[in-house]
Amino acid sequence: GFRKVEIKNKQLLVNGQPVLIKGADRHEMDPDGGYVVTLERMLQDIKIMKRLNINAVRTCHYPDDPRWYELCDQYGLYVTAEANQESHGFGYDNTSEAKKENFARQILERNQHNVETLFNHPSIIVWSLGNETVDGPNFTAAKEWILSQDKSRPIHWERAGTGDNSDLFCPMY
């Protein structure tokens, strides 16, 4: 399907209509199969979410199985597609490893992979730069690259707070 995502007057709009996100985080973990999630379990997850009036899901903290996005497209769940970027334990101050040059390529490539492989899914309404790491030049470069490829979706990043690298203020906890 087609859709237009925009932010006007601090309101998220999809196809010109205000959207109240009632979302959940989802890890690819199955109570029976561990890290192997069957298509049947994915469908069960979607049906439970729909029954609970959940309209959005964040793929935390990595891209999910490609079939998950196809199901979200089919069943009408909005998706925040999160890049495989997690830096717990690296700190959040100016000395954080995530701000250093040795992480620049990794942060950029993980965001590039996320956008390049998932771009055509209409369920994806937000790109996420990653989870809980410190803001800085590496994330600025990742955001700039995403915007060079796709200006049609807002960019989210939980630790950015109200900084320049997130179009949405969306504290997770």
Stretches found by the model and what they are:
Residues 1-49, 70:
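N-terminal carbohydrate-binding accessory modules
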Residues 46-49, 56-173:
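Substrate-binding/catalytic cleft of secreted carbohydrate-active enzymes
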